């Protein structure tokens, strides 16, 4: 096993060097889109055998990382990375029912995002999100009367919270953390045991069940999960509260999906809202806004579980052998219309 892990490590280094050379050439000759297809050649690494045998989860029981040898199934700090085939979904469902959990899902639908995305998001969530569980959909919008009526199953409710309309789309994104922190300290935080926060411009395409639950949950970004850490788009402006020095950072996480217990998310949203306020007071704005601060938080406070890109996939990337069953799919963006 040690020899196998060593060979995988050398293979990973070799392919990174090849990719870098081909990538630089590709950038000059063909442009960036051609380069994207080469990154799938980089091996993701292998979970050490000592860690692999110890991977367990409160909802899925013993995990099966050996069922996915082609992908990385654990983090350096011993948290599982959840891939299709690495867990028993029936065990997770049974455990969640025994605990009689209520799971919250927050969605911000502001401006044209409401009319373009919200209805499909909610309809597909009813098919795939925590099926058979008690669920609270918390929709935050400046137009509560425009929220579509969606047929909900037993034990599932859809409270709507009014929020102020922000002037810029960047401010909408960044105000989310402050609003979530307040909500988690109020009624939503008392109603739900676990909470997920998701972007509305995506839709469910497969089962998103209790296997995703943990004290704190991060989502690998589908555009960056093959990249070495030094190429990841962390905030590098040393003056920003989200700044991460070169050499810091392990995975790049997507702010379109994150979750955890109410207490853990209170800490996460307090950190991100505080960092955003710090930057604003100094006339700064992190490159990727609240996502930059989210990644800084998960660097300082490691998540208990990481979801593979299968749980939030971009169809623009195209098919990948390791992406067996996408759970969420990004919707076409149309930023020029939506953000005007």
Curated annotation (Swiss-Prot):
Entries under Pfam families matching the protein: Glyco_transf_6
Keywords associated with the record: Glycoprotein, Glycosyltransferase, Golgi apparatus, Lipid metabolism, Manganese, Membrane, Metal-binding, Signal-anchor, Transferase, Transmembrane, Transmembrane helix
User: According to the lineage, what is the superkingdom?
Assistant: Eukaryota
Where is this protein found? Golgi apparatus, Golgi stack membrane
Reported cofactor(s): Mn(2+)
Q: Which residues are glycosylated?
A: 58, 100
Q: Which InterPro entries match?
A: Glyco_trans_6 (IPR005076), Nucleotide-diphossugar_trans (IPR029044)
**Positions that bind Mn(2+):** 199, 201
The chain's Lumenal topological domains, given as residue ranges, are 33-340
Positions on the Cytoplasmic side per record topology:
1-12
Catalyses which reaction?
a beta-D-galactosyl-(1->4)-N-acetyl-beta-D-glucosaminyl derivative + UDP-alpha-D-galactose = an alpha-D-galactosyl-(1->3)-beta-D-galactosyl-(1->4)-N-acetyl-beta-D-glucosaminyl derivative + UDP + H(+); a beta-D-Gal-(1->4)-beta-D-Glc-(1<->1)-Cer(d18:1(4E)) + UDP-alpha-D-galactose = an isogloboside iGb3Cer (d18:1(4E)) + UDP + H(+); a globoside Gb3Cer + UDP-alpha-D-galactose = a globoside GalGb3Cer + UDP + H(+)
- Transmembrane residue ranges: 13-32
Q: Does the keyword Glycoprotein apply?
A: yes
Q: Name one GO cellular component term.
A: Golgi apparatus
Q: How does it sit in the membrane?
A: Single-pass type II membrane protein
Q: Which GO terms describe its molecular function?
A: glycosyltransferase activity; metal ion binding; N-acetyllactosaminide 3-alpha-galactosyltransferase activity
Annotated GO biological process: carbohydrate metabolic process; glycosphingolipid biosynthetic process; lipid glycosylation
Top enzyme category: transferase
SUPFAM superfamilies in the record: Nucleotide-diphospho-sugar transferases (SSF53448)
Q: What is its EC number?
A: 2.4.1.87
Q: Which Gene3D superfamilies match?
A: Spore Coat Polysaccharide Biosynthesis Protein SpsA, Chain A
Sum up the protein's function in the record's words.
Synthesizes the galactose-alpha(1,3)-galactose group on the glycosphingolipid isoglobotrihexosylceramide or isogloboside 3 (iGb3) by catalyzing the transfer of galactose from UDP-Galactose to its acceptor molecule Gal-beta-1,4-Glc-ceramide. Can also catalyze the addition of galactose to iGb3 itself to form polygalactose structures.
Similarity-based family: Belongs to the glycosyltransferase 6 family.
* Domain remark in the UniProt entry: The conserved DXD motif is involved in cofactor binding. The manganese ion interacts with the beta-phosphate group of UDP and may also have a role in catalysis.
Protein name per Swiss-Prot or TrEMBL? Alpha-1,3-galactosyltransferase 2
Say which species the protein is native to: Homo sapiens
Q: Which lineage is the organism of this entry classified under, starting from the top rank? A: Eukaryota, Metazoa, Chordata, Craniata, Vertebrata
Q: Which gene encodes it?
A: A3GALT2
């Amino acid at each position: 096993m040690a020899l196998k892990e060593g060979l995988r490590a050398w293979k990973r280094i070799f392919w990174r060097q090849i990719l870098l050379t081909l990538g630089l050439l590709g950038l000059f000759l063909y442009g960036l889109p051609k380069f994207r297809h080469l990154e799938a050649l980089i091996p993701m690494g292998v979970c050490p055998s000592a860690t692999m045998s110890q991977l367990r989860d409160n909802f899925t029981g013993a995990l099966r990382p050996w069922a996915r040898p082609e992908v990385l199934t654990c983090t350096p700090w011993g948290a599982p990375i959840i891939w299709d085939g690495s867990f028993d979904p029936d065990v997770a469902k049974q455990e969640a029912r025994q605990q009689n959990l209520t799971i919250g899902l927050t969605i911000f639908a502001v401006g044209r995002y409401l009319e373009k995305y919200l209805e499909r998001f909610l309809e597909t969530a009813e098919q795939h999100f925590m099926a058979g569980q008690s669920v609270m959909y918390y929709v935050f919008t400046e137009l509560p009367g425009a929220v579509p009526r969606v047929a909900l199953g037993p034990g599932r409710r859809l409270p709507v919270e009014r929020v102020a309309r922000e002037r810029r789309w960047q401010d909408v994104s960044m105000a989310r953390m402050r609003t979530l922190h307040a909500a988690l300290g109020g009624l939503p935080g008392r109603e739900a045991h676990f909470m997920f926060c998701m972007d509305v411009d995506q839709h469910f395409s497969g089962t998103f069940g209790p296997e995703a639950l943990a004290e704190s949950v991060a989502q690998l970004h589908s555009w960056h999960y093959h990249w070495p850490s030094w190429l990841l788009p962390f905030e590098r402006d040393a003056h920003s509260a989200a700044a991460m020095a070169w050499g810091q950072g392990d995975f790049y996480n997507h702010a379109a999906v994150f979750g955890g217990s109410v207490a853990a998310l209170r800490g996460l949203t307090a950190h991100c809202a505080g960092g955003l306020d710090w930057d604003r007071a100094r006339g700064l704005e992190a490159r990727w806004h609240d996502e930059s601060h989210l990644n800084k938080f998960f660097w300082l406070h490691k998540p208990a579980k990481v979801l593979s890109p299968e749980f939030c996939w971009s169809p623009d990337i195209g098919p990948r052998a390791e992406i067996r069953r996408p759970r969420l799919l990004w919707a076409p963006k149309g930023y020029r219309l939506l953000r005007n």
